[in-house]
């Protein structure tokens, strides 16, 4: 029977890929710095995670019971209780940047009360977020802000500032998702309009005499 790795902590995720744990409740990671690449594994998330995938170094073959729409240049998100099966591409070193944080990090903050509004964390969602080049840079800039805060000595403002920057990233992702679905709706409507025009032309030409 396949073993399921329980990612109940940030430290457990860092251990899986050979990262140094800077903070017990949050990590900003870059897969180019990873030293461990299990060829295939299944994880049960106990933390929140978002990843910007920059190449085809791995594939998520199962996300719950659905195949994940996960291509190059996309963001995927995971929440506590979700199960994911990952297969590494043996010919390509994975390139991805990501954020992992434990629910305890945001406990008692305004963000904790808003998490249910970030629908891209939903278990039923199997669609990745496809970013433009500008959006990718915004995503990376948000990660850098969090990373800068993690590199500072902890003080009474640390938790609040880290949480606020995570919330900023999540709000940007909501904006990007909205843009993605609006764009798709316009494209689908355009296709339907052209199809209806073709039908009108067909019936005009073939109208019974």
Enumerate the language-model features and the residues they cover:
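Generic protein-terminus/edge-of-domain signal
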Residues: 1-68
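A hydrophobic/aromatic-rich effector-binding and dimerization subdomain
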Residues: 20, 89-152
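Amphipathic, well-ordered alpha-helical segments in soluble domains
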Residues: 49, 138-145, 165, 169-172
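A cytosolic small-molecule/anion-sensing beta-strand core signal
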Residues: 54, 71, 80
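Histidine-centered metal-chelating micro-motifs
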Residues: 58, 76, 81-87, 106-107
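Short acidic-glycine-tyrosine-enriched beta hairpin
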Residues: 65-77
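Short, Lys/Arg-enriched, Trp-marked, Pro/Gly-tolerant hinge/linker segments that flank
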Residues: 130, 153-160, 175-208
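Amphipathic alpha-helix face/heptad-repeat signature
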Residues: 135, 142, 158, 162-165, ...
